[in-house]
């Protein structure tokens, strides 16, 4: 089956609900997002992709000379009923758009084996596997997983209300840490 989708730059709010419904994380809260793309079948949104600054402070230094040289592919999600190779089609179109319309040099993405991902789609899109992250941990709270930095988020020097609730839950035993496997790191060079 031939892929006949349109790839369009969109605003964050155009894809927020779609990502929250279809991506395994069910969230884009807290993401630094620079570019958003929608994958459309006619007027129907069937996929979303979000690029932004790397989640880890100063991690960009491994890949570029300055922070603006590097973006992370933060979210990629398509509905299940798309033809084979739709993900690589979508990635390829967004990479070409970024190369034509930005000065970004490097795209970094992570494949999370904790969700059964090994990076097949990145290898199919000519990303280079450059290693693994360190093992991490998440916080299980109210039946959901949260990044362990959720207990450190501050606003004007004070812990945010949600961070206080999670910290209290850890203290009283209603939340707990769970170890995570290291993630695969993939890199795509847009330009030298």
Stretch-by-stretch model annotation:
Residues 19, 33-53:
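Conserved beta-hairpin
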Residues 1-31:
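Short amphipathic alpha-helix that is part of the acyltransferase structural core
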Residues 1, 13, 45, 65-67, ...:
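A short, polar/charged loop/turn motif at coil->beta-strand junctions and beta-hairpin connectors
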Residues 31-34, 133-134:
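A short, compositionally biased
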Residues 6-9, 52-172:
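Acyl-donor binding region in acyl/amide transferases
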């Amino acid at each position: 089956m031939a892929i006949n989708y349109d790839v369009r730059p969109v605003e964050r709010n155009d894809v927020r609900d779609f990502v929250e419904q279809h991506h395994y994380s069910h969230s884009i809260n807290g993401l630094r997002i620079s570019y958003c793309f929608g994958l459309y079948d006619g007027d129907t949104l069937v996929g979303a992709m979000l690029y932004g600054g790397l989640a880890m402070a100063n991690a960009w230094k491994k890949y570029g000379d300055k922070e603006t040289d590097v973006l992370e592919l933060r979210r990629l999600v398509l509905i299940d009923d798309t033809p084979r190779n739709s993900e690589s089609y979508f990635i390829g179109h967004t990479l070409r758009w970024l190369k034509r319309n930005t000065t970004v040099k490097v795209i970094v993405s992570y494949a999370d084996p904790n969700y059964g991902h090994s990076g097949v789609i990145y290898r199919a899109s000519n990303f280079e596997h450059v290693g693994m992250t360190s093992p991490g941990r998440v916080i299980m709270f109210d039946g959901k997983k949260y990044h362990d930095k959720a207990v450190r988020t501050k606003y004007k020097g004070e812990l945010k209300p949600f961070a206080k609730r999670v910290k209290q839950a850890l203290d009283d035993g209603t939340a707990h840490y769970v170890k995570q496997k290291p993630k695969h790191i993939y890199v795509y060079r847009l330009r030298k």
